[in-house]
Amino acid sequence: MALNLEDKKAVVAEVTAQVAKASTIVVAEYRGITVGDLTKLRAQARQQGVYLRVLKNTLARRAVEGTPFAELAEQLTGPLIYGISEDAVAPAKVLNDFAKGNDKLVLRAGSYDGKVLDVDAVKALATIPSREELLSKLLFVMQAPVSGFARALGALAAKQGEGEAAAA
């Protein structure tokens, strides 16, 4: 269905708003993917907080114009699906994981921190743990010595309690 000028302006405004908040954009070619598979991909993206959109490349170029993602415009050819997120790794992770199980979805490029990423860089970005995972690992590492110390004190107190009970 063709979009009229007002619809196109609305789409560009919506995508521009998402791009303004984003730290990463990943694009993938979706040629030949079924509607059911695309629906599953959208659901996975929604769960991870990724804005996923099939968009005409001309409209996408206009949306990234004047942003740190402007250099990505050269990569926008063919039928593409755009993953946009504030989380640096989420779009790469969602699209890469889905592409592993569906050969019809092919990663094409990405952009992070104003730099255009090739396919290998997008795949590498997808392997990085998310911010929440890193924070939980850091918390675990910080808590481990404290909990070990607390267990040692508890064992020492129990041992002294046994010694006093035997002396009485």
UniProtKB/Swiss-Prot annotation:
PROSITE patterns: RIBOSOMAL_L10. Belongs to the universal ribosomal protein uL10 family. GO terms for cellular component: large ribosomal subunit. Forms part of the ribosomal stalk, playing a central role in the interaction of the ribosome with GTP-bound translation factors. Keywords: Ribonucleoprotein, Ribosomal protein, RNA-binding, rRNA-binding. Part of the ribosomal stalk of the 50S ribosomal subunit. The N-terminus interacts with L11 and the large rRNA to form the base of the stalk. The C-terminus forms an elongated spine to which L12 dimers bind in a sequential fashion forming a multimeric L10(L12)X complex. Signal peptide: none annotated. PANTHER family: 39S RIBOSOMAL PROTEIN L10, MITOCHONDRIAL (PTHR11560). It comes from the Bacteria. InterPro entries: Ribosomal_uL10 (IPR001790), Ribosomal_uL10-like_sf (IPR043141), Ribosomal_uL10_bac (IPR022973), Ribosomal_uL10_bac_type (IPR047865), Ribosomal_uL10_CS_bac (IPR002363). CDD domains: Ribosomal_L10. GO terms for biological process: translation. One of its GO terms (molecular function) is structural constituent of ribosome. It comes from Ralstonia pickettii (strain 12J). Pfam families: Ribosomal_L10 (PF00466). This is Large ribosomal subunit protein uL10. The keyword Ribonucleoprotein applies.
